[in-house]
Amino acid sequence: DGEEFDWVSGGTDLLANYKWRINTKPHVISLSKIPGIDTVSNLEIGCMARLSSLEGGNVHPMIAEAAGKVASSLIRKSATLGGNLCLDTRCFWYNQSEDWRRSIEWCHKADCGTGSDCRVIPNQNTLCVATYQGDIAPVLMVLGASVHLIGPSGERVMLLSEFYQLDGMKKNVLEKGEFLLK
């Protein structure tokens, strides 16, 4: 994530959040025109690969089955692997309309700067427990998948299991301006 922008691939989750004014940024940068990042093979899946292309693609059967169970067929035709792996965390308290969020006390994720409490686990005041909601990551982790990240500091590769954080606000290890390539 960048401070002033979000990367968008399929947009099925990000754009819905923007509609609710959740974590909006001044700019959205599409990855759709970058050539070759929609590849699907048995060894490599690009970040722009549509989930629908994984259902019947040349991938491990567990990946195909998991992709086929995500949402509806219409969403799978737009949703991408990169978007699914980089979903924002979800919280019953935070992922509501702007008016609803204003009607309750702030939480860690709302970033009001007051040292607020987590609404899910009150009185612990140290950690946001909003959870990751993606469908494909668990299967890829079981298979020992790695992710390739690229950004201003160059490229890096890590196990997908090392990509996520145990914090609802800092959901993954992406640095400013970096994105998941494959």
Task: Locate predicted features.
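C-terminal structural segment of proteins
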Residues: 1-182
